[in-house]
């Protein structure tokens, strides 16, 4: 299975180096996961938006150097949506990117939303803690989700 996130970058943090780091972080989500009870090889990538990219599959990521526009000031992405804003100074290469990209893929948080702290019963997955492990919960949620990503069976 191939998961592609066609993405347009903007913001003061959208330097060539930060865009490359973002793409590397997304590519690092690739691996073998349990999808629907079957071990499945999954490749995850960021692609450029081209004229042929369906509008519904186009994502916009704003990279900022400091607090985001969210009331908390933290990185965020629309759940199953097309837009996200990431603070490149906050754990940018330590899990924030896979966490927020998983939101775009339709996967919700597992941590305690009241405290913002990881839920010990929910393990070390990227949707419970950052940094965390990209696991079958996150990848399976993207594969099975209905969001602004392009999925292709190989």
Regions inferred by a protein language model and the residue ranges of each:
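Catalytic zinc-binding patch centered on the HExxH motif and its immediate surroundings
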Residues: 52-88, 116-121
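Short pre-active-site segment immediately N-terminal to the catalytic Zn-binding motif
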Residues: 10-18, 77-98
